[in-house]
């Protein structure tokens, strides 16, 4: 005989009305009790004293829920190794100080899957054990690696629609690609990116400064920046800056030595290539092996523009397969592309700049290849970090990013939603304004920026030291 129990509206669990199922329910209750008891200890190792800037955003959301009953469904997604589990742990320990501890739940969804437990079953058992009404009472639910739950998007949608639970769920960068449109309208999507130098300084030196990117880059206002620049660089060493360029944008670089960081990055790449990529698009093993070779080619410190034809020939794969592979690596947020400035035809025909979103991937691959990091390498890393900063700014403010494909053309062109253009040139030494002025004339830009060694404004050109630019976002 089969009996149906209503758990949430439109969601049913079928259980057999015999002693065997009763035994399973007892085992589930035992599991939930044991899990809740051991969670504080398990998460304590992730509960770092220093917190990423994203923590403050999540903490504010939790406070609004506790104080004003403003529930939310927040999806944190991003590349492996960026500290999503640490953020959940920090929010878990904070929330337990604000409401009854047993109303803060954390589940690692891969562990539930390993134990063949569905999230809805776990919540039903929790509700029965503690006598808590899921529909009305305040509960904070933290879910790590939500993609391990089958039909996770529908489960979260129904939880959000039918209960009073505040939910934060984490997942890989590919997570957003597979959610239903209904959930997309309900959830707040919060991407977790690699760290900027400003965040790195806060976590390593306890130096906290505000972002001055718009004030400096868009408005040429250097008054506050000059004070910040002088103050910061009186407290740190040149090696601090170079270490950030090499490995500092990844949170685990804060605690591990450099060799261990490179090993962790390589392990992370293996998981992304052979696991995450296959969740987005099915490739055979030979193609996935070629993906690794592709990363090595893209890490060339002297190369930055790539044609699909030359890459496909080198890798001995079809051009279409290569395009699909790069597209998936971009969706996994391992890479991002910068298109040439100009017409749609030019964007398609001309080579793209392909950058690593976490710049330390490049140095980890250099380490594997035995590359000694010299000034040329640091120049390559600097341009990649500048590209990463501009990428972040474009994501937040709706700008777009291009480069000028001709020889001697601008490294970057920042384009506002109103089609105002800023030409940007990057280098470690003193740079002349001649090249920038020519690029400005060609693309009809209103402003130019030279990231080098100087700090001044001459006409419509801003000169900013590269070490100062790193402080802006």
From Swiss-Prot:
Range of residues in the leader sequence:
1-19
Q: Name one Pfam family in it.
A: DUF4143
Q: Which UniProt keywords apply?
A: Signal
State the name under which the record lists this protein.
Uncharacterized protein MJ1637
Q: Which CDD domains does the record associate with it?
A: AAA
Q: Name one GO molecular function term.
A: ATP hydrolysis activity
Q: Which chain positions lie within coiled-coil regions?
A: none
Where is the organism placed in the taxonomic lineage, from the top?
Answer: Archaea, Methanobacteriati, Methanobacteriota, Methanomada group, Methanococci
